[in-house]
Amino acid sequence: MAEGQAIQIINTHGQQVVDTWCFNAADMTEFMSMAHLHATLESIFPAEGDALVTNHRRPILTLERDTSPGRHDTVIAACDRHRYALLGCDNDHDNCTDNLASALAEVGLEAPVCPSPLNLWMNIPIGPDGGVIWGAPLCKPGDYVTLRAAMDCVVVLSACPQDMIPINGAACTPTEVHYSLLG
């Protein structure tokens, strides 16, 4: 995406978590960082108008619009083959970490690491004891977010394929999402 361009990500059927990454197009070692975001926002929940920052503490995206209840996770790492092995799955279970690598490889890019993603619509409240609660998404079909680029960047999305726990709703069935690039 070019600086100033926006992407609208639509939760077509509702309930679908979308792992979202963003990298500086000129330097893939600079990427959207949830740990740096926490310090910048002094919150773990980004809201409309918030700048999403990189590991260099520079704005890379702005959460411009959010028609959902606004619950997005910034704490949980992307699912990977190791997570699924712990859940008793085969080593070849689809996962967001491999989806990131595959999507970047398709355009001739490679991430130096798999950063913790912005998990759109993933409902992970923090309990009174500090533990995480694995809640179902609060969004409904057609909810969307609009993210505007603060620099030239590469955005990667993965409709989370989690089908072992109800993070994508009670049916445990991942569904597609849609996106549009806006001027």
Regions found by a protein language model. Give the residues of each.
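Acidic, Ser/Thr/Pro
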Residues: M1-G183
